[in-house]
């Protein structure tokens, strides 16, 4: 019963996965977000200044590609944490507000990042989605 209520209030957010961009779809609308994050080094603490978009001044930031074989420039930059924030950003952008009810997230085409994540893509995506606020997660 609770699943029916949650589905009516939030529905499913479908995320189509590719190394260069994720496509978030919900209730007939979709948004594409490139899979990189701009970080600014503030005396040893990194601040996220942009997700999936370049902006004026982004050239002075550290750009971290979430699904690149190239390692981030600093070992304190953790891609799983950035992936969680990336998914949270995408969920908020597609739903358009902070949802009272947490959505069900459905990932599609996860095989597109299998090589980069050595076959652990489903586990990585599921964990990131739950941490980003998903009620439940499915892999199609």
Locations of regions flagged by a protein language model:
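Nucleotide/phosphate-binding catalytic cleft detector across ATP-hydrolyzing
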Residues: 1-140
């Amino acid at each position: 019963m609770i699943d029916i209520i949650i589905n009516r209030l939030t529905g499913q957010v479908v995320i189509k996965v590719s190394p260069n961009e994720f496509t978030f779809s919900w209730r007939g609308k979709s948004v594409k977000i490139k899979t990189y994050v701009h970080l600014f080094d503030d005396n040893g603490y990194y601040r996220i200044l942009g997700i999936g978009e370049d902006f004026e001044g982004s050239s002075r930031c550290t750009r971290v590609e979430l699904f690149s074989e190239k390692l981030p420039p600093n070992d304190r930059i953790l891609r799983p944490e950035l992936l969680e924030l990336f998914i949270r950003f995408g969920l908020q952008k597609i739903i358009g507000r902070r949802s009272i009810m947490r959505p069900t997230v459905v990932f599609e085409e996860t095989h597109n990042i299998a090589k980069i994540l050595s076959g652990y893509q489903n586990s990585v995506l599921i964990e990131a989605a739950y941490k980003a606020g998903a009620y439940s997660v499915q892999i199609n």
